[in-house]
Amino acid sequence: MQLKIQLLMLVLMTVLTGVLGKDGYVVHEDTNCKYSCDVFKKWKYCSPLCQKKGAETGYCYSFACWCVGLPEETLVYGDKGTYCWE
């Protein structure tokens, strides 16, 4: 019985992780560099940009756009093979 509960929890966690998506700094498609932003306008630029990339929302964090709830296939800074070419 306990094993069944553990398996059920594992399946639920896997499904929820896929549904919620991933978070990260979105990158320019041509350079793989982060989108820079003004930290004093935390949501104004980044939220629409992130939503255009498929995220739930986004905000300026450490002078770059951090997106929340991105689709798994969206490339973010730090993914394997993402290097800024600028």
Curated annotation (Swiss-Prot):
UniProtKB keywords: Disulfide bond, Ion channel impairing toxin, Neurotoxin, Secreted, Signal, Toxin, Voltage-gated sodium channel impairing toxin
Name by which UniProt lists this protein: Neurotoxin LmNaTx35.2
SMART domains in UniProt: Knot1
Function text: Binds voltage-independently at site-3 of voltage-gated sodium channels (Nav) and inhibits the inactivation of the activated channels, thereby blocking neuronal transmission.
GO biological process: defense response
Family indicated by similarity: Belongs to the long (4 C-C) scorpion toxin superfamily. Sodium channel inhibitor family. Alpha subfamily.
Residue ranges of domain LCN-type CS-alpha/beta in the record: 22-85
A GO molecular-function descriptor: sodium channel inhibitor activity
Disulphide bridges, residue numbers: C33-C84, C37-C60, C46-C65, C50-C67
Keyword Secreted appears in the UniProt entry: yes
Compartments it resides in: Secreted
CDD domains assigned to the protein according to its UniProt record, in alphabetical order: neurotoxins_LC_scorpion
GO CC, alphabetical: extracellular region
Entry comment, domain topic: Has the structural arrangement of an alpha-helix connected to antiparallel beta-sheets by disulfide bonds (CS-alpha/beta).
Signal peptide (UniProt feature, chain positions): 1-21
Species in which this protein is naturally found: Lychas mucronatus
PROSITE patterns according to UniProt: LCN_CSAB
Tissue: Expressed by the venom gland.
